[in-house]
Amino acid sequence: APSLVGSEMCIRDRLNLLLQKVETDMTIFFRELCHIEEPKIEHLKYAFYDKESIPEKEWNDWLEEWWDRVEGKPNRKLMLDNNPKYVLRNWMAQLAIDAAEKSDYSVCKTLHDVLKNPYAEQKDFEKEWYQKRPEWARHRVGCSMLSCSS
């Protein structure tokens, strides 16, 4: 058992290093990992902001090791129960704030509805709310850059 723990830490450390190499939406990455049917990075590319800079061989090697470790049968229920599909992101909150400032509370209501069941698939909300940070939010204060005032 001790060697498994050491090996487990190694695979986790390698995952962390890989996730740092390319800008990744962690929520989408871990949610999509729950659904893969084979250890191929192509099934997870939606989670990356720059698909061209993905070190595919390194990713496929990691996925193969993980896949072998779970014997090709990841515990999907456990993974899905621990990786929400929908989380409140700064850009989503900003959309709700912008609309509310114009007396339109529909975005707040929609976000409230989505976030009541963050682990559910909710296909009706997928296109609008299951996505990486939009380009408009990349440099907008409050969406990607946060400040702290004292």
Language-model segments: which ranges?
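Single conserved hydrophobic/aromatic residue that forms the stacking wall/gate
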Residues: A1-G6
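Regulatory N- and C-terminal appendages and interdomain linkers associated
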Residues: S7-S150
